[in-house]
Regions:
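Flexible coil/turn and secondary-structure edge motifs
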Residues: 1-175
């Protein structure tokens, strides 16, 4: 569900379902579900920061989860279902923390989204890739109306004319 959701956002190039930050190599879904590998089920998101920024991606993601829930999303339970943001660029930490801090006041319980550097990532089995495209009506914890929110969230803005004083300051008299 999260991969399909993220793919709806303009500026997201690719998504890949996988397993992150565990303690074995090349885990299978079955191994991850056993709960002893330390992996979280994740979605790698590659995006164009000139089209969509990290803050918007995080805010949209947070709309699809309960950020106060530990080891559970929807009907899925277990440590592999913990929520997290795993970054590959430490310069993103400030944006991640600020975005999380900004939503914290909306909740009565503490935010428990894990924020850590990505230590390892293994692509999940092909069955999990593009799951909702291959399984119309398949189980998804994300409410259907949120997919439309993702599609509209980053719509291109129409040209906005600058005010006259700004135009005078940047244009020559001939222009």
């Amino acid at each position: 569900g999260t991969a399909h959701f993220m793919k709806q956002i303009k500026g997201v190039k690719t998504t890949e379902v996988g397993y992150a930050n565990g303690n074995t190599s090349n885990p299978s879904y079955k191994q991850v579900c056993n709960g002893n590998t330390g992996f979280a089920e994740t979605v790698k998101v590659i995006y164009n920061p000139q089209i969509v920024d990290l803050e918007l991606l995080i805010n949209l993601y947070l709309n699809t989860i309960d950020p106060t829930s530990i080891n559970r999303q929807g009907n899925d339970q277990g440590s592999q279902y913990r929520t997290g943001i795993y970054y590959t660029d430490s310069s993103d930490v400030h944006t991640i923390n600020n975005t999380i801090r900004n939503i914290a006041g909306k909740y009565n319980k503490p935010i428990v989204v894990e924020i850590k550097p990505l230590q390892n990532f293994y692509k999940a089995e092909e069955f999990h890739q593009n799951y909702l495209d291959k399984n119309k009506g398949g189980y998804c914890h994300i409410r259907p109306e949120l997919f439309e929110l993702a599609r509209r969230a980053n719509e291109k803005t129409k040209f906005k004319k600058s005010d006259d004083s700004t135009l005078r300051s940047i244009l020559s008299k001939e222009q």
